[in-house]
Amino acid sequence: MIEEFGGAQDEYTRQQRWAHILTIIVAVAMLLYGLNLRIGALNATQLYENPEAGVRVSYPANWLIDEVAPYVFRVRDMSRIGFKTTIQIETQPAGDQTSASAIMSQLDLNRAPTTDSYDRIANNDIYIFSDETESLRGEYAFVFQDPNPFLQSIPIVVRGTDIITIRGGQAIIITFLVDANLYDESIATFERFLASLEL
């Protein structure tokens, strides 16, 4: 009788061990599944096409799109507190002799009087699109103060990146603007945007 009781207890213990192992495996599988769903939701995109401007690109699905002049296309992450992360594309006429660096200088001249503490960080870096087209990449920073006088907030340093290319008699300016504290974690979104861009 003692042997039978011990045998039943061993069997019960073996079942418990398998139950524990199976529970751990299921829990890990569910965590991985949840992580996969989260990554999929964060990286979900929507397609934007504008045949008149010759632009086709995928942008983050949960961002607000705006197509009002002076830009062809602008999307903003409205879930951000403070400065809203922005990606925009605008075009300007460009003559045969116009260079991307001249457009970059003109942007600096236009922005300096309208933004606080505007400063060019890096200039004249070459950026190559997936179709091997060369363009100019420049980075800058400025201070953003919320225009609403009823909101008391600390000014935010904004970091911007411009990619300028000249095609078909027009300069195409792709701009990325983000809170400087979030630049490193947000630049991957801009890189995915550029990788999907067809001009």
Predicted regions and their residues:
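Surface-exposed amphipathic alpha-helical segments
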Residues: I2-A8, W63, R167-L199
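Conserved polar/disulfide-associated segments of primarily extracytoplasmic proteins
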Residues: G6-R14, G40, I65-V178
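Hydrophobic membrane-insertion alpha-helices, especially the h-region
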Residues: R14-R38
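Alpha-helical interaction segments
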Residues: T23, E52-G54, S130
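N-terminal "mature-domain start" segment
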Residues: A41-Y71
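Extracytoplasmic/secreted proteins, especially bacterial periplasmic and envelope-associated proteins
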Residues: S58, A102, Q106, E185, ...
